[in-house]
Amino acid sequence: MRIGRRTFIAGASATLGLVFAKPAFAREKIKIRDLYKTQAEFSDQAKSFAASREVINVPGFMAPPLKADASFFVLTQRPMAVCPFCETSADWPSDIVFVRTSKIVDAVAFNRPIMTTGILELGEAKDEETGFVSLVRLVDAQFEIL
């Protein structure tokens, strides 16, 4: 059986399309360090994710819990000994993200990497429940230990 040139090209194109296509379930990922362009300005990628309100993945580590039975945690690249957002956004480090979940969070050891999934929000905001002030948040979030 011979395959014509048009049939071959159509088949090859379809196959390449499947190989290079992103799966529908794949989510965009951004590292904490890529949220900022400068210390005081968010990156274009972070602004785009926040504007689209699409669900994204952010890898990192869970900081030790600030209180028991909480539905939030701090995602960071390193452990932190103090509450970084209890006072004002002026003290907000550029390597943490406030994460709000829909259920109580079971604490994870500070040195276990996790992947957090949620909707990115940017800009100063005060959490109604806790009173914490944040510049970067993941809301409607979930996480898994890697």
Locate the predicted segments by residue.
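OB-fold and OB-like single-stranded nucleic-acid-recognition modules
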Residues: F25-L146
